[in-house]
C-alpha cells in the first residue's frame, strides 16, 4: 500500500434499526473522514459520523443510483485524500451488496480495504418474528436468493436455488411477488407453500403478510409501501399462515353476524 493512501472500510449498516449496528461499525463511523452511503441507511446511523463528509451513492433497487464504476472510482480517489474512508452499505456488505466489485477495484488500485459485517434483513426479520429459519425435522438449510438477473445470467439459477431450499428468503423480490409465486409453482413448489412478505424488518413500521404461493400469485394490488421487503418461503412459516387463515374465518363470521335478518 502507498504510504499516502488511506484504508477503505466496507461497513454493514444492518437491516435498518440503528441499534443493530455493530460496535466496530459505530467506532469506524466516529473516526471516518468521508462516508459514501446507500439509500437505505438510517439517518441516526449516518449521524454517528459526526466529523465526516457524507456522500449519497444511491444503490436502491429499481430506482436511480450511482453507477458502480463511478462508486469504485470515488472510493479510490477518496483513499488518496483521506485516512479513513467508509463505504456504508445496508444490511451486510457481502450479501447482495456488490462488495466484491468494490474490493477488486480497490485491490487493483493498491488500496487497502477492510470489511465489517452487518446484520442482514433476513436474520432481523427472523428475530422480530421469533421464527427460526432452520428447524429440526423441517428445515435443514436456508437459501438467500434474488430474482434480479444481471447481464449474462440465467434466470433458471435463482429458480432452482429457491425450489431446492427448505427455507428460501428472496431479496429485491416484492415488486414481482405474484409472478415469482407463479414461477415457483410452475417449477414444482407446492401451491400451499407458506410465504411471508416482510417489509421494513427491524424498524417500528415493520409489516408482515402471511399467505401461500397459490394466493400470492393471484394478488394484483401493491403489497408493500416502498420500504425494503423480503419474500420468505418455507414450511417453517406454516403457523403464521394458519393464524392468518383463522383470522380470515373470524372476520367472515363477524361480517355474517352483522347482516340483518330479512323479514
Where in the sequence are the language-model features?
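Hydrophobic packing residues within well-ordered alpha-helices of enzyme cores
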Residues: 45, 106, 125-126, 180, ...
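Short hydrophobic/aromatic-enriched beta-strand-loop microsegments
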Residues: 53-59, 110-114, 133-140, 188-197
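Class I SAM-dependent methyltransferase SAM-binding "motif I" and its flanking Rossmann-like core
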Residues: 94-164, 207-210
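Acidic/glycine-enriched edge-of-secondary-structure segments
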Residues: 55-67, 135-146, 168-169
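Class I S-adenosyl-L-methionine
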Residues: 1-116, 215-217, 229
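A contiguous loop/helix-start segment that scaffolds small-molecule binding in enzyme catalytic cores
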Residues: 2-8, 80-85, 141, 149-263
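Alpha-helix N-cap/helix-start and coil->helix boundary motif
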Residues: 42-43, 120-122, 177
Amino acid at each position: 500500500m502507498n504510504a499516502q493512501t488511506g484504508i477503505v472500510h466496507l461497513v454493514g449498516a444492518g437491516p435498518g434499526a440503528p441499534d443493530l449496528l455493530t460496535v466496530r461499525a459505530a467506532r469506524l463511523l466516529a473516526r471516518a473522514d468521508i462516508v459514501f452511503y446507500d439509500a437505505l441507511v438510517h439517518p441516526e446511523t449516518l449521524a454517528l459520523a459526526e466529523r465526516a463528509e457524507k456522500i449519497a451513492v444511491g444503490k436502491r433497487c429499481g430506482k436511480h443510483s450511482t453507477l458502480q464504476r463511478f462508486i469504485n472510482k470515488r472510493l479510490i480517489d477518496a483513499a488518496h485524500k483521506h485516512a479513513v474512508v467508509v463505504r456504508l452499505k445496508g444490511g451486510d456488505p457481502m450479501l447482495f451488496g456488490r462488495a466484491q466489485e468494490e474490493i477488486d477495484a480497490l485491490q487493483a488500485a493498491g488500496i487497502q480495504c477492510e470489511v465489517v459485517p452487518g446484520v442482514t434483513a433476513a436474520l432481523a426479520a427472523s428475530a422480530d418474528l421469533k421464527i427460526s429459519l432452520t428447524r429440526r425435522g423441517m428445515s435443514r438449510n436456508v437459501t438467500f436468493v434474488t430474482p434480479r438477473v444481471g447481464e449474462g445470467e440465467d434466470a433458471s439459477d435463482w429458480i432452482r436455488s429457491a425450489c431446492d431450499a427448505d427455507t428460501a428468503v428472496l431479496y429485491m423480490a416484492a415488486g414481482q411477488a405474484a409472478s415469482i409465486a407463479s414461477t415457483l409453482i410452475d417449477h414444482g413448489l407446492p401451491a400451499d407453500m407458506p410465504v411471508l412478505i416482510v417489509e421494513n424488518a427491524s424498524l417500528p413500521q415493520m409489516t408482515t403478510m402471511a399467505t401461500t404461493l397459490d394466493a400470492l400469485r393471484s394478488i394484483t394490488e401493491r403489497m408493500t409501501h416502498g420500504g425494503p421487503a423480503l419474500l420468505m418461503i418455507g414450511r417453517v412459516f406454516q403457523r403464521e399462515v394458519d393464524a392468518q387463515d383463522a383470522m380470515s374465518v373470524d372476520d367472515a363470521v363477524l361480517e355474517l353476524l352483522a347482516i340483518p335478518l330479512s323479514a
